[in-house]
Amino acid sequence: MSSDLRLTLLELVRRLNGNATIESGRLPGGRRRSPDTTTGTTGVTKTTEGPKECIDPTSRPAPEGPQEEPLHDLRPRPANRKGAAVE
């Protein structure tokens, strides 16, 4: 990526964020847009209910008992296939 294009992308990001610099010029109308801020207040409440440990709802249940894990997820292939690596 050329340095001119990199500078142009950086300038675009700065303008979108409201952080325009002297080198990048001014926004039309001579006004600079302030960065987005959260105007409302945010509160955090402590709850005592629920499990003591973190549980990921997207995770699969733990297996019951020892299970052998495959070394890889690929199908077994014959060793004499065309283009096979020589071991």
Curated annotation (Swiss-Prot):
Post-translational modification: Phosphorylated.
One term under GO cellular component: host cell mitochondrion
Region called Disordered, residue ranges: 18-87
Record flagged with keyword Glycoprotein: no
Keywords carried by this UniProt record: Host mitochondrion, Host nucleus, Host-virus interaction, Modulation of host cell apoptosis by virus, Phosphoprotein
Region (Nuclear export signal): 5-16
Biased composition (Low complexity): 36-48
Impact after mutating residue 50 to D: In strain: Isolate CRNP5, Isolate CRP3B and isolate CRP3A
Predominant cellular place of this UniProt entry's protein: host cell
Region forming the signal peptide: none
Name of the protein: X protein
The species this protein was found in: Borna disease virus (strain V) (BDV)
